[in-house]
């Protein structure tokens, strides 16, 4: 008998019919003797609908964060109650709880709260009594009793946090894909599902644009060593196990995956006086506006001036460009130029630690396709490059083949 935390996302509980299917799956695990805690998101689209209501009533003002948390937290209350009803109908004793009812204690940062502590006594009592415990994801309560929410993707974090608190054998994340792939199968048809991947690799892939798991959930799982498994909600299969182990084998590829992100934009401030502290003068106002900077390149000084280039999320390009124009005037830079038609492609793998020449192999594969590299960033298990967006899919396919990640052709194909 295992203690398993299962998390189902919005598409998995997007209708009564789908909730019935989730109930059937949960019952199969319960019949096999497992103790279960099930974490649910709101129905697909429901959180956005509730936010739109809050915006409509607030008019020209931003919705009050505390009240916004109160309204959006109701989405999960619907799904947890419906699933508990569906399970009881099937003869499986089940009870539903909101985040506040099971004392998922958070800080008071409304709409983006962080989990501080979980009181697991109520859940353990229900499990001991033979009940399936269904918990609302995405939400908690602060020390003053205010409802809080964890931000987008918070249900994944709820699931992992509960698994850590309960010392569960596994946390299963159910999605609309059957695991973590070497890259997006919609771009590379011969991409392969990974049986296993490390937390470190998954964290890099999540931060680089992979949408399978939220970064915070992977960080939490890695910190508390919670085994994670990504599975398809309605298809049977082993999924992908995410653990701390780095298993070496003769057949293990150097690279585990190719990640990419289309939502990048690049800004360059040219003719910057090459003086101490110039990087702070450029990036300080950007940081002050809560704009996240990704990759940074500063050219070698020429005639006591330099060019400074960095990337931001495309949604923040306009705001960053306005700030940079003001900075250019203040520091006496020559001009600001931008580019929103770029993309980032990255190779990720713990095998890079023990193999030399990985970056050059990447650059060679791109050169063979006449793809120009504009920026480069590296870490111990990652190499990222910025290229023209129009070459993105070609680059991903070329790298996938170059690092021998393509699935072998089936017999007869």
Model-predicted regions and their roles:
Residues 1-218, 299, 311, 386-388, ...:
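Nucleotide/pyrophosphate-binding catalytic subdomain
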Residues 32, 90, 224, 289, ...:
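Conserved dinucleotide-binding and phosphotransfer motif residues
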Residues 93-95, 227, 292, 372:
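Conserved beta-strand segments of alpha/beta enzyme cores
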Residues 170-174, 228-230, 294, 375:
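Short hydrophobic alpha-helical runs that function as membrane-insertion/retention elements
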Residues 221:
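Acidic-aromatic/histidine active-site loop/patch
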Residues 231-233, 237:
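Internal glycine-rich alpha/beta core junctions
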Residues 239-413:
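A conserved regulatory-domain signal marking ACT and ACT-like small-molecule sensing domains
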């Amino acid at each position: 008998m295992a203690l398993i935390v299962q998390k189902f996302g919005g598409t998995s509980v997007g209708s009564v019919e789908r909730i019935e299917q989730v109930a059937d799956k949960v019952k199969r695990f319960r019949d096999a003797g497992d103790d279960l805690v099930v974490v649910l998101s709101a129905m697909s689209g429901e959180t956005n609908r509730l936010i739109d209501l809050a915006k409509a009533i607030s008019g020209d003002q931003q919705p009050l964060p505390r009240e916004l948390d109160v309204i959006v937290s109701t989405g999960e209350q619907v799904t947890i109650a419906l699933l508990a009803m569906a399970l009881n109908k099937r003869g499986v004793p089940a009870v539903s709880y909101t985040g506040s009812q099971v004392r998922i204690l958070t800080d008071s940062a409304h709409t983006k709260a962080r989990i501080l502590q979980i009181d697991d006594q109520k859940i353990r009592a229900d499990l001991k009594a033979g009940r399936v415990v269904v918990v609302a994801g995405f939400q908690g309560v602060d020390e003053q009793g205010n409802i809080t929410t964890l931000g987008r993707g918070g249900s994944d974090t709820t699931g992992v946090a509960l698994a850590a608190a309960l010392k569960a054998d596994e946390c299963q994340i159910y999605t609309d894909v059957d695991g973590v792939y070497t890259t997006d199968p919609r771009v590379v048809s011969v991409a392969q599902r990974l049986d296993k991947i490390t937390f470190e690799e998954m964290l890099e892939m999540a931060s680089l644009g992979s949408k399978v798991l939220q970064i915070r959930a992977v960080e939490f799982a890695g910190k508390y060593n919670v085994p994670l498994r990504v599975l398809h909600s309605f298809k049977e299969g082993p999924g992908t196990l995410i653990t701390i182990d780095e298993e070496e084998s003769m057949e293990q590829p150097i690279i585990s995956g190719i990640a990419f992100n289309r939502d990048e934009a690049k800004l360059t401030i040219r003719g910057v006086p090459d003086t101490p502290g110039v990087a702070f003068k450029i990036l300080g106002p950007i940081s002050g506006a809560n704009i996240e900077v990704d990759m940074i390149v500063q050219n070698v000084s020429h005639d006591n001036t330099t060019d400074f280039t960095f990337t931001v999320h495309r949604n923040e390009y306009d705001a960053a460009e306005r700030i940079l124009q003001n900075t250019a005037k203040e520091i006496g830079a020559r001009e600001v130029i931008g580019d929103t038609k770029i993309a980032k492609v990255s190779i990720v793998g713990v095998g890079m630690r023990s193999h030399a020449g990985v970056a050059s192999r990447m650059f060679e594969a791109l050169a063979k396709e006449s793809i120009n590299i504009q920026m480069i960033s590296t870490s111990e298990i990652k190499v990222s490059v910025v290229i023209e967006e129009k070459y993105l899919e070609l680059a991903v396919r070329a790298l996938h083949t170059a690092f021998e990640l393509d699935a072998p052709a089936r017999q007869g194909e």
